[in-house]
A protein has these predicted regions:
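Alpha-helix-loop-beta-strand connector modules within alpha/beta enzyme cores
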Residues: 70-77
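Mid-chain, well-packed structural core segment of small domains
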Residues: 33-64, 68
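Short, ordered loop/turn segments at secondary-structure junctions
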Residues: 52, 83-85
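Conserved mixed alpha/beta catalytic, RNA-binding, or beta-rich assembly cores of soluble enzyme
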Residues: 1-39, 59-62, 76, 84, ...
Length: 122
């Protein structure tokens, strides 16, 4: 976050403050129902869903639901991703064809950094 890598590069010229972080609490993501409200009450203006939800094997099956549910229930925008996708994950998902569907370019775009950055996150 401090280096503005990955999805945080959208805030290059802004001050950032971390208001909290949590796990999803495992499938089906019970924390997603409550944690955004607490973060919003503490001053968060955007919720970032972890890059791990995208790069996992397989990616989180509830990701699309989470990114629609949070803004609908709490009125706070959601960005998919935090840190850059590591190179080794990108290569594996390319070989597996995981991100070949039409929804994936938009989902991975915020965290798809240049190769040098991806390698630094390996």
């Amino acid at each position: 976050m401090c280096r503005r890598d990955g999805a945080f590069r959208a805030y290059l010229m802004q001050d950032l403050e971390l208001f909290g972080y949590t796990t999803c609490e495992g499938c089906p993501g019970g924390n997603v129902e409550y944690a955004p409200e607490e973060m919003k009450n503490n001053g968060a203006t955007v919720i970032h869903l972890a890059t791990g939800l995208v790069v996992g094997y397989p990616p989180c099956p509830h990701l699309d639901h989470f990114r629609r549910f949070i803004p609908e229930k709490y009125g706070i925008p959601v960005v998919v991703g935090t840190h850059p996708i590591p190179q080794k994950y990108l290569l594996t998902h390319e070989r597996l064809g995981t991100w070949n569907g039409p929804e994936w370019p938009e989902l991975i775009a915020p965290t798809l950094a240049d190769e040098r950055t991806r390698l630094a996150y390996d």
